Curated annotation (Swiss-Prot):
Keywords: Ethylene biosynthesis, Fruit ripening, Lyase, Pyridoxal phosphate, S-adenosyl-L-methionine. This is 1-aminocyclopropane-1-carboxylate synthase. It comes from Dianthus caryophyllus (Carnation). One of its GO terms (molecular function) is transaminase activity. It holds the Pfam family Aminotran_1_2. One of its GO terms (biological process) is fruit ripening.
C-alpha cells in the first residue's frame, strides 16, 4: 500500500510535496526525536536527553526581560502601550516600519564596532530563514549552483535548495589548516562545476562560521571578493553570528572590507543577518537581507510581502535597539558571558582528553572525537553518535551532517541551557569517557582484543600559532553498541550523495530580478 500510495501521490501532487527535500525524515533528525521523546529536566526528568544540538543563545534573557519591565510602552500588550494597538494592528507598508529599519541598520553598525554605516533603505526584512531563500530566488534560477565551503550549516540544504531548486556545491576545508578556505579548493570546485555544465552563480559563506565557531580574516574576505569579481558571480555572507565573537581575532564584516576595494562590483555582494543568534530571539523570526544591488533590494522587498515580520515585533524591536545604553551594555555583557561559558566548557573537556577546534565565536564548539573511532568512516561516526544520544543521553550534531570530510568531528552547543544543566552534560561526558577507558562498558568487543595502532592528528589553534601533535593510541577492534537501527542516507536534506539533486531541475527559468521595477 505504501508503494502504491507513493506513486499515487506523485501523480496528483507537486515535486515539492512528494520529495524529501525538507529532510526531516533523514537519520540526522534522530537526535532531535530522541530529545522530543525524553527531554531532560532537572527535577521532572533528570535522566532525559540534554539538548546540545540547538544553536540558541539563552545567556542574556535577563537583560532583555529587565529592559521590558522598565519600558512597558514598547509592547502593545501593556497598559502603557495599548494606545498604540490600532496603529500596529492595521496593514503596514511591507517595506517595514521606518523606525524598525533605522534601528536595525544602526544596530548592525554597532555590532561591527561602528566601522561600517548601513543604509536603512537597503534593508529588506523577512520572516526568519526565508530571508536567505528570498535572496537566492533573486540571484539564481533552478539548476544554478552556489559554491559553499564544508563543513557548513546543514539546514542550508532546506533553506536554500528545497523550494528554489538551486544547488549547493561543497568544497572541502581541512583540519590540516584549521578548516580555512583556500583559493585552490575554491578554484577547483568552480572548474569542476563548469566541466559538468553547471552554472555557478556565487559563493555562500557564514562568518562567523557555523559549525566551526571561527571568523574569516581580512585576507580571506579579500580573496573571495576578488574571486567573485573576476568570475562575475555573487558573494553571499551570512553574518548571523556577528556579535557572538567573544575573543580575538575580532569579527570583520565583508561590508568593512569592500570599502577598501573600489574595483569590486558591489552589485555582487549581499549580507544576510538576523536577531536570532546575536539577541537570542529566534522566535521573533526577524531575518534581514542587506544588498548593495538596487534590483535585488526592490525584488526582495516585493517577495518579502509573503513573509513579513509582524508589526508588533517590529514595534518592540525598534524601541529595544534604539536604546543606545541598553545596546551597549547588552553587547559587552553578552560577549563576556559567551567567553566564560566557552572557557568553562572547553577547559572541562580538555581535562578528560577531548579537544576542540580553537574557536572564538558563536554558540558552539567543534569537538574532536576522532580518537574514539577505530575506523575513520562516516559509519563509525554515526555509531558513536547514536551511543552519545541513547546512552550518554546528549543530543549533539555529527560532522557528517555538516558535510565534513573528516569523520569524528561533532558540533556541540553550549549557550542554550543554564550552568547547572551544562555541568550535568559535562558529568555525563566525563563518565562516558572514563568508563570507556576503564572497562569499555559502552562497547562490545568484536574480536580478541588484538592491539592496533592508530595515528590521530589533533590540531590546536591559537591566534598566532598552530601546533600539530601526532598521538599514537592502541585500541582493540571494537563495535559500538547501538540502540537504533542503522539506516542508509535518503535523498534530500543532508545526504552527501544528493547535493546536486533538485526537485525543480526540469522547470523553466524564472528570472524574477529581470522584472520591471
Amino acid at each position: 500500500m505504501g508503494s502504491y500510495k507513493g506513486v499515487y501521490d506523485r501523480e496528483i501532487l507537486s515535486k515539492i510535496a512528494t520529495n524529501d527535500g525538507h529532510g526531516e525524515n533523514l537519520e540526522y533528525f534522530d537526535g532531535w526525536k530522541a530529545y522530543d521523546r525524553d527531554p531532560y529536566h532537572s527535577t521532572k526528568n533528570s535522566n532525559g536527553v540534554i539538548q546540545m544540538g540547538l544553536a540558541e543563545n539563552q545567556l542574556c534573557f535577563d537583560l532583555v526581560t529587565e529592559w521590558l519591565l522598565k519600558n512597558p510602552q514598547a509592547s502593545i500588550c501593556t497598559n502603557e502601550g495599548v494606545n498604540k494597538f490600532m496603529d500596529i494592528a492595521i496593514f503596514q507598508d511591507y517595506h517595514g516600519l521606518p523606525e524598525f529599519r533605522s534601528a536595525v541598520a544602526k544596530f548592525m553598525g554597532k555590532a561591527r564596532d561602528e566601522k561600517v554605516i548601513f543604509n536603512p533603505d537597503r534593508i529588506v526584512m523577512s520572516g526568519g530563514a526565508s530571508a536567505s531563500e528570498t535572496l537566492l530566488f533573486c540571484l539564481a534560477n533552478p539548476g544554478d549552483a552556489f559554491l559553499i565551503p564544508s563543513p557548513y550549516y546543514p539546514a542550508f540544504n532546506r533553506d536554500l535548495r528545497w523550494r528554489t531548486g538551486v544547488n549547493l556545491i561543497p568544497f572541502t576545508c581541512s583540519s590540516s589548516n584549521n578548516f580555512k578556505i583556500t583559493k585552490e579548493a575554491l578554484q577547483s570546485a568552480y572548474e569542476d562545476a563548469l566541466k559538468k555544465n553547471i552554472k555557478v552563480k556565487g559563493i555562500i559563506v557564514t562568518n562567523p562560521s557555523n559549525p566551526l565557531g571561527t571568523v574569516l580574516d581580512k585576507d580571506t574576505l579579500k580573496m573571495l571578493l576578488t574571486f567573485v569579481n573576476a568570475k562575475n558571480i555573487h558573494l553571499v555572507c551570512d553574518e548571523i553570528y556577528a556579535t557572538t565573537v567573544f575573543n580575538s581575532p575580532s569579527f570583520i564584516s565583508v561590508a568593512e572590507v569592500i570599502k577598501d576595494m573600489p574595483h569590486v562590483n558591489q552589485d555582487l555582494v549581499h549580507i544576510l543577518y538576523s536577531l536570532s543568534k546575536d539577541m537570542g530571539m529566534p522566535g521573533f523570526r526577524v531575518g534581514i537581507i542587506y544588498s548593495y544591488n538596487d534590483r535585488v533590494v526592490s525584488t526582495a522587498r516585493r517577495m518579502s510581502s509573503f513573509g513579513l515580520v509582524s508589526s508588533q515585533t517590529q514595534f518592540m524591536i525598534a524601541a529595544l535597539l534604539s536604546d543606545d545604553d541598553f545596546v551597549r551594555r547588552f553587547l559587552v555583557e553578552s560577549r563576556d558571558r559567551l567567553f566564560r561559558r566557552h572557557q568553562h566548557f572547553t577547559s572541562e573537556l580538555a581535562k578528560i582528553g577531548i579537544g576542540c577546534l580553537q574557536g572564538n565565536a558563536a554558540l558552539f564548539v567543534w569537538m574532536d572525537l576522532r580518537h574514539l573511532l577505530d575506523e575513520a568512516t562516516v559509519e563509525r561516526e554515526l555509531k558513536l553518535w547514536r551511543v552519545i544520544i541513547n546512552e550518554v543521553k546528549i543530543n549533539v550534531s555529527p560532522g557528517s551532517s555538516f558535510l565534513c570530510s573528516e569523520p569524528g568531528w561533532f558540533r556541540v552547543c553550549f549557550a542554550n541551557m543554564d550552568n547547572a544543566t551544562l555541568d550535568v552534560a559535562l558529568n555525563r561526558i566525563r563518565s562516558f569517557v572514563t568508563r570507556g577507558r576503564v572497562d569499555n562498558s559502552t562497547m562490545t568487543t568484536t574480536s580478541a582484543r588484538a592491539a592496533a595502532t592508530t595515528t590521530t592528528t589533533t590540531t590546536t589553534t591559537t591566534t598566532t600559532t598552530t601546533t600539530t601533535t601526532t598521538i599514537k593510541k592502541k585500541r582493540g577492534q571494537m563495535e559500538l553498541r547501538l540502540s537504533f537501527n542503522n539506516r542508509r542516507f535518503e535523498d534530500g536534506l543532508m545526504s552527501p550523495h544528493s547535493i546536486l539533486l533538485s526537485p525543480h531541475s526540469p522547470m523553466p527559468q524564472s528570472p524574477l530580478v529581470k522584472a520591471r521595477t
